[in-house]
A protein has these predicted regions:
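Conserved sequence signature across two-component system core domains
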Residues: 12-13, 38, 56
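Active-site residues of response regulator receiver
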Residues: 13, 59, 87
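The feature encodes the CheY-like receiver
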Residues: 18, 58, 63
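Short hydrophobic/Thr-rich beta-strand motif most characteristic of the beta2 strand and flanking loop
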Residues: 31-39, 47
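Acidic catalytic/metal-coordinating carboxylates
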Residues: 40-43, 64-69
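Short amphipathic alpha-helix used as the core "switch/output" element in two-component signaling
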Residues: 46, 68-80
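Active-site beta3 strand of CheY-like receiver
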Residues: 51-57
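Short, flexible helix-to-coil linker/hinge segments that flank and couple to helix-turn-helix
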Residues: 93-100, 104-135
């Protein structure tokens, strides 16, 4: 991603209304291009392999492959893709597990679209195991 290119993002959430809402909210922001939306971790991995996004916005609790499992695989298979968790779970254990699995940022679903967009941008700019929390 260069400064003049939009941030390419995949969204993964098992709740259709949340997933579709995030596509509309983030896709309407300048500088963000939502390139795919998945209902589970396996679909998310396939979309990341297909589209090579800069970042993925990922829920923790999804069917087939949950967010932690998807985060571990994404971090191993696509280390250049920034992983940002967006979930309803704010407990320390969930935060620590997600960050240890490879997430660069962790937000709860009460974050507004500006906070989510900033977390995605900050995480995409981070390198290595740098963490952006909160963004």
């Amino acid at each position: 991603m260069t400064p003049d290119q939009p941030l390419r993002v995949v969204i993964a959430d098992d709740q259709a209304s949340v997933r579709e809402g995030l596509v509309l909210l983030l896709g309407g922001l300048p500088g963000i291009d939502v390139v795919g939306a998945a209902a589970d971790g396996e679909q998310a991995l396939a979309l990341v392999a297909e589209h090579q996004p800069d970042a993925i916005l990922l829920d923790l609790h999804m069917p087939v492959l949950d967010g932690i499992g998807a985060t571990r695989r994404l971090a191993a298979e696509h280390p250049g893709v920034a992983i940002v968790v967006l979930t309803t779970y704010a407990d320390d254990g969930s935060v620590i597990e997600a960050l240890q699995a490879g997430a660069r940022s962790y937000l709860t679903k009460d974050a507004d679209r500006t906070e989510i967009a900033q977390a995605l941008r900050t995480a995409a700019k981070a390198t290595g195991s740098a963490l952006a929390w909160p963004a």
